């Protein structure tokens, strides 16, 4: 629907994991979307969360290798290279493993989702772009450092890699309402965030134990109520002016664009309009 009703915006999934979806299926889906959007598709690949995968009986084995092999397979398929591939994660693919139609582009940008240091380095090594999880935004500096390490290892210039930082975002002139919209998200995902990320704002995993206990009891209202002011800093929230200030701080770290994630605000549609009319226009005017 987005592809059919737009002409300039890039479209694509962020982020698909190669445990629940085979690379061949991912390739067929993304080249179809690329054709529907007249060459505007982008693809995000990430290892997914081990605990969430375990809920459906899957084990997150060798995530780094699996993502790396997935990217290689996808590039072969999209470029219509009929070459055999053999790896530890997906076994042996013969030359018969190719798309039975020619994609309109031989290359679709592949962005790698990451929060751990090794996966962040992989962005620098092989990614056309990166989708680092910045929960909180203060993690950006360390994320960029890791991406740069990977880029140097592959003899690449990190400035050529599009780093699209993923942030939680809640926009409202009423700061209390903006924070209230964040409570459920932080309560649900906060206990699963990497310690190296949350320590940037003085949190540790034990801080989320009471929330996790409440969720296990299906006591979601208590879980939301236990979200603290410090935990709110995992996200960007507040008025347009407050959000712009934090986005400017993020820009200084080397992030090239921002992937604005949920909840957007207490009134999501209104927030989208304000992001377009005020926040995006502000940054366009300062270029």
Predicted regions and their residues:
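Active-site-adjacent structural elements that line small-molecule/cofactor binding pockets in enzymes
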Residues: 1-287
């Amino acid at each position: 629907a987005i592809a059919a009703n737009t002409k300039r915006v890039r479209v694509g999934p962020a982020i698909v994991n190669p445990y629940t979806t085979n690379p061949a299926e991912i390739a067929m889906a993304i080249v179809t979307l690329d054709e529907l959007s007249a060459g505007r598709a982008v693809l995000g690949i990430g290892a997914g969360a081990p605990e969430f995968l375990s809920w459906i009986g899957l084990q997150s084995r060798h995530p780094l290798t699996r993502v790396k092999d997935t990217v290689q397979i996808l590039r072969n398929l999209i470029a219509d290279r009929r070459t055999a591939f053999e790896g530890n994660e997906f076994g042996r693919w013969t030359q018969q493993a190719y798309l039975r139609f020619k994609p309109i582009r031989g290359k679709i940008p592949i962005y790698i989702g990451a929060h751990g240091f090794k996966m962040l380095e992989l962005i620098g090594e092989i990614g056309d772009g990166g989708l680092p999880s910045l929960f909180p935004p203060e993690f950006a500096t360390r994320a960029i450092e890791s991406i740069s390490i990977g880029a140097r290892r592959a003899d690449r210039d990190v400035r050529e890699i599009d780093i699209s930082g993923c942030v939680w975002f809640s926009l409202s002139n009423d700061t209390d309402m903006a924070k209230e919209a964040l409570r459920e998200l932080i309560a649900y995902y906060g206990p699963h965030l990497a310690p190296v990320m949350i320590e940037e704002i003085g949190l540790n995993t034990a801080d989320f134990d009471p929330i996790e206990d409440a969720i296990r009891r299906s006591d979601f209202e208590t879980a939301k109520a236990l979200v603290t002011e410090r935990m709110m800093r995992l996200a960007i929230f507040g008025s347009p002016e407050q959000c712009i200030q934090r986005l400017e701080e993020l820009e200084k770290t080397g992030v090239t664009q921002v992937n604005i994630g949920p909840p957007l605000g207490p009134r999501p549609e209104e927030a989208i309009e304000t992001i377009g009319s005020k926040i995006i226009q502000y940054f366009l005017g300062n270029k």
